[in-house]
Amino acid sequence: MIAISYRNGYERQRMPRQASTAFTGACLAGLLSLPSAAVGAAGLPDGFVYLREVAPAIAQDMRYYGSHNFIGRPIDGYQAPECILTREAAAAVKAVHEDLAAAGLRVKVFDCYRPTRAVAQFVRWSRDLEDQRMKAEFYPNIAKTDFFRLGYVAERSGHSRGSTVDLTLEPAAAPPSQVGARAEGPAVACTAPFAERFPDSPLDFGTGFDCMDPLSHPNSPAVPSEARRNRALLAQAMERHGFRGLPEEWWHFTFKAEPFPDTWFDFPVTAPGE
């Protein structure tokens, strides 16, 4: 399914000049998930921006660039620890951040646009039942055979449309995150008490990020009351600015007025200027 070989994510083919006028919209079906949009000045497809250029105060802990994620290694297509979003979604996330700044909080993002090649890697990994090395931390109570049925992994992801973001909140004075960092020693379950599990944020949201467990459901009554309040604070702020959540993940939100609702992209995540 992945046929992308160029830095900006487009597969290009040479054709005779006289044949170029016959290159119609029907030919684009062979490009799988990519639109015919031109590449913008930042090296991204038109309509996409780097979040740090729109809202530099938002913290970024891009988990799929490093190894601290549910697969345990860097993910295909993540060539830089950058959050890329559609222009509309980035503006809305910035508005959420500004909304909550008055309360001394800031937004921290874990994942934004996700290439389809990364989703394909998730699918392959989910079907490899021998690879269980990250189970103790990220899915301690769930069998890999149930990932698809329970909605934790899918053949397609809204992230690949560019208007979905995984995020949390933290105090504005919190120190910068170390991308992919995890303390040495035995892995602790993402469902463990707040003081014991990996500190995704100084605020308790009931589970760690990417925790595949019913406790991650936004409305789970089984998490502490403080976590429920923090989840509600995040969800209400996101909804005020045009996002909708996901029933399985408290950290996952999609901008409802997304500009590419039927297009899944595969350009790699690169740093500005690359």
Give names to the regions the model predicted:
Residues V39-C112, T116-P247, E258-E274:
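Extracytoplasmic cell-surface/polysaccharide-interacting catalytic and binding patches
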Residues F253:
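Conserved metal-phosphate-binding beta-hairpin within the catalytic cores
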Residues T24-P35:
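Bacterial N-terminal signal peptides
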Residues M1-A19:
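N-terminal secretory signal peptides that target proteins for export/translocation
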